[in-house]
């Protein structure tokens, strides 16, 4: 018998963690939100919160043993994963410590997909110094992408068009790298037709479910807008689902995974994977009967998912801060919400820097183009001000 309530610890309390916390509270769970800064979005929902450096293994272990959760849900990559491996003997880690460790580093997930599973990816190589970078860049060819092996939300990513840009790209990647790693990945630039996320749900009954594919656009590697359903041929969708299942089956565990692909003609090229709700999946807050956060919690808690319904053409657009402030204020909600089938979700971040993601606008319409226009208009209506 599955006895509730469960005590859930979130490691990471940003906007995605906040929506996970909301979904958990609706199922009667006790939520403990953790992050490196106070008043993080999920902390505003949680029953309890802790502020500490989650990269510090001793601090992480101390907080986990003090709180004694039933389930630990990592919501970010910057974690002392060795502690999770040890803790996993006593406490459930979602999806598991191995998947968390593999997906926090671009080299590990890329090696798994390309080398172990023989899945098509962009051509890639690694470098730990400038001379290796120069050598591998000539082999891969220009243009190419340079990224830190450890980073998130596109931090440290550069599109390099010729060898004159290599030094600057190297310096940026090292500067923005998470932790002390000086390893970078060089990646072939794919001139793709479409970039998609396939939300893939592994359940405790052994079944795997898929949401309708989500198309998205990025700027410097960071999500800007998404739409659902993305238009794919049946054969392309089937290929993407097969690849997503192969990779997630290898990683194991339960929960929702965000699997990213490049689509070029009939070719499906694996890009990245997150073992948790995905930022591009924020569109599901309006597009589906169960959003990605509710699906994640149902899979984690062993609750049935009878069906996943994508209602109609839907889109999202991020709301970005235009200034740096510790006193966040904004206007424009009246205009943003004057359109039918439109909503705005502000994340409640306590401070902003220029370009920081502070919210998202979502909309439904008869067509994807109409939904995207509505979401764009709503997002543009929200303006940040100095009070």
From Swiss-Prot:
Binding-site residues for N(1)-(5-phospho-beta-D-ribosyl)glycinamide, renumbered to this chain: 15-16, 75, 279, 349, 356-357
What does UniProt give as GO cellular component?
Answer: cytosol
Where ATP binds, per the record, is at: 106, 147, 152-157, 187-190, 195
Q: Biological process GO terms, please?
A: 'de novo' IMP biosynthetic process
Short name of one Pfam family for this protein?
A: ATP-grasp
Q: Which residues cross the membrane?
A: none
A GO molecular function term, named singly, is:
phosphoribosylglycinamide formyltransferase activity
**Quaternary state and interactors:** Homodimer.
> Per its UniProt record, what PANTHER family does this chain match?
FORMATE-DEPENDENT PHOSPHORIBOSYLGLYCINAMIDE FORMYLTRANSFERASE
According to its UniProt entry, what is the function of this protein?
Involved in the de novo purine biosynthesis. Catalyzes the transfer of formate to 5-phospho-ribosyl-glycinamide (GAR), producing 5-phospho-ribosyl-N-formylglycinamide (FGAR). Formate is provided by PurU via hydrolysis of 10-formyl-tetrahydrofolate.
Stated name of the protein: Formate-dependent phosphoribosylglycinamide formyltransferase
